[in-house]
Amino acid sequence: MPKFRILIVDDSVIVRRIINNILSESDWIEVVGVAPSGQIALAKIPQVNPDLIILDVEMPEIDGLETLKRIRQTYKQLPVIMFSAITQRGAIATLDALTLGANDYITKPANMGSKEKAIEYIRKQLIPKIQVFCHRKVSLTKHCLAPSMTSFQRKTSTQLLTLKLEIVAIGVSTGGPQALYQLLHKFPASFRVPIVIVQHMPPVFTTRLAERLSSQCKIPVHEAKDRDVIKSGEAWIAPGNYHIILVREGKQVRIQTIQTPPENSCRPAVDVLFRSVAKLYQGAVLGVVLTGMGQDGLHGCTSIREMGGQVLVQDQASSVIWGMPGMVANAGLADQILPLNKLAEEIIRRIG
């Protein structure tokens, strides 16, 4: 089987060397080129024919965003992973890059001076993401059948479509910012129930994402804070590095931010939120799993279904990565599997 070909683009020689060394440890990866600038990268792409590009966000002359724009003019489907700093500017630039067509991103370690820690930090983020795009390339020629509805699903769906839903809980990862925009901007200001969201992102990034979505949508979107009271027609996104759960105090439902251990290597984790809403709202929950890598949300959807709630998942064709929604669908937990552009309409229909 041919090796997976990668082009590294970063103005730092140290970073290029670290990434090159990490990738060279894997016998299924071939680093076919390195480039210190966007200009050189654009010239190299047709020469080395990469399967994936790792692209630094901040570079002199032509920065990562401009380089990405030019890549997308010619190479619509070539996967690009952005390499970004965990700063306000880095978060904004990364969200811009995802809007412009970047497939995913990784964040730079806070201290590049500690070489061993920096290497391990980058390795843990980067290799799993590359594996996903490698597997995706291999599977593109395979015909995938949508999982069929199980008897468990048919029974539950029929019983509960008449139950009044009281909350929407959304879990999403890779491809999430664009998916959330495409979903949330279709909800009217009069949306009847609260929305709580887990998007796998680090601190600062979740703050900027909430601000951006709130400016683009008819409903307010907040980064969740401890003891926030949730309200109908508003959305809350879990802050980076914190799980969120919901607790009832009298007639109010509040958010709790907690730092219990990561689940599925994630904090915030979809499973933590979904278990919480299933326990609190029982059958009055609509869980929605959008594009994302891994299986976070699978156990949470099991909890939602066991308590009598409903689950929708994004389909494979419209997902950047059909990991999280695919796991839920293949486990027979989804009431419906829908393209992203049909999900908002179905959510509104079910909420009533």
Swiss-Prot record:
Gene designation: cheB
Keyword tags: Chemotaxis, Cytoplasm, Hydrolase, Phosphoprotein
Chain ranges of the CheB-type methylesterase domain: 166-352
Subcellular localization, as worded in the UniProt entry: Cytoplasm
Protein's job: Involved in chemotaxis. Part of a chemotaxis signal transduction system that modulates chemotaxis in response to various stimuli. Catalyzes the demethylation of specific methylglutamate residues introduced into the chemoreceptors (methyl-accepting chemotaxis proteins or MCP) by CheR. Also mediates the irreversible deamidation of specific glutamine residues to glutamic acid.
Coiled coil: none
Domain notes per entry: Contains a C-terminal catalytic domain, and an N-terminal region which modulates catalytic activity.
Protein name, UniProt field: Protein-glutamate methylesterase/protein-glutamine glutaminase
Modified residues (4-aspartylphosphate): D56
Signal sequence coordinates: none
Protein family (similarity comment): Belongs to the CheB family.
PTM annotation, UniProt: Phosphorylated by CheA. Phosphorylation of the N-terminal regulatory domain activates the methylesterase activity.
Gene3D superfamilies documented for this protein: 3.40.50.2300, Methylesterase CheB, C-terminal domain
GO molecular function: phosphorelay response regulator activity; protein-glutamate methylesterase activity; protein-glutamine glutaminase activity
Keyword Membrane: no
E.C. number(s) listed in UniProt: 3.1.1.61, 3.5.1.44
Substrates-to-products reaction catalysed: [protein]-L-glutamate 5-O-methyl ester + H2O = L-glutamyl-[protein] + methanol + H(+); L-glutaminyl-[protein] + H2O = L-glutamyl-[protein] + NH4(+)
Cellular compartments per GO CC: cytoplasm
Domain Response regulatory: 5-123
Gene Ontology biological-process entries: chemotaxis
Active site: S173, H200, D296
Enzyme class, UniProt record, top EC level: hydrolase
